[in-house]
Amino acid sequence: MLGIGRSFALAGATVCLLIAVIGAANAAGALAVGVCGAYGYGFDFRKETDARAAAMSKCSGGSCKVVGVVRRGCAAMAVDSKNPCGSFGWAINSHLGKAENISMRRCFDFGGRDCVVRAWACDEKG
């Protein structure tokens, strides 16, 4: 009976390891930012290039560019709600709350007066 318990434990550990490996393989993300509050993101891609392409394709504003790559974390973007074509900030962090706070602080640092988080996204870890 003890041997069966060990077999189940080994099988369970193997499944957990497989899930972790698959999760790590899908941990690429990207954030693209454009003018007047435009943004796009792509998360949970196997390849960074695919995440970048998804972020760019979802960014509907002009002059979009990928500003950051996420690996098992979160990205946030804040804009001045009264002037979305003015100040903005973005951040990438392993924790959503920190990414949001940093993006807000950067928006205020660049002259925003009424900054709000416009977008956020986390990959499978976040």
Where are these regions (language model features)?
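Secreted/extracellular ectodomain signature
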Residues: L2, A24-G126
